[in-house]
Amino acid sequence: MDTPAVRRWFHRTGKRRVLVFVHGFDTRHDEAVFRFAQLVHDTGTDFVPVLFSWASRGSVWAYDYDKESATVARDALERVLRTAVADPGVADVTVLAHSMGGWPAVEAVRQMAIRDGGVSAKLGNVILASPDLDVDVFRGQLARIGRGPRFTLFVSRDDHALALAKFVTGGGVRLGAIDPFAAPHRAMLERQGVDVIDLTAMSGGDSLNHDKFTKSPDVVRLLGERFLAGQPVSDAHVGLGDRVGAVLIGTVGSVTTLAVGAR
């Protein structure tokens, strides 16, 4: 990693907030660039955008290859995050990871906690959209991280890509497909202070229901106006009329209907 170049990029726009996006499985570099550029445009966020691109083969038949590549990438991602939080010109850092990208993202934060005895307060939010991550592994990662960034999950029980990942991995429950109300997940989420947005009742916009967080205008607006602005949904009343069964389980175990319109 060219650390001086990364630092120059942080300072290029004069903005003090950094958004690091980690793409998911079966995503070539050009596809990741397009997706992130579209997301930055649609959310209208006031961030320095940083795409962390790892070596996906870009094939649905290369799951094991991509998982190994994502694992290798966690050290480089840790260096990017460490560079960001150490820069005096950076005020806060948000990580947004999709699908398999959630694995190196949480691992990088875990490694920071191990090396430093904690995570910098500048790393304020980690948002995992449709995370392809074993739920028990995630529980262990959070235990090791301890007091750290706010974690937010976008989940959907009808995510067919994660259903296939569960089969490929031998039946391990994928974090992005949990029922946040069901035991033992709810207790874990409450105990760890994890916020969860359940998008199951929404149409997916794609045949696999794996990209709901970018396909729904309401969810994109929610990302831009609240999460990426550092304002958790639990801090504000939201209302758009028609509702679906989206929920928030926050640090005090509250459950709130979110303003995400049906499609």
Where are these regions (language model features)?
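Lipolytic serine-hydrolase domain surface
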Residues: 4, 10-13, 33-49, 53-92, ...
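Gly/Ala-rich beta-loop-alpha elbow adjacent to hydrolase catalytic centers
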Residues: 77, 96-105
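Serine-hydrolase catalytic-loop signature spanning alpha/beta hydrolases and amidase-signature enzymes
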Residues: 26-28
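Alpha/beta-hydrolase fold active-site loops
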Residues: 17
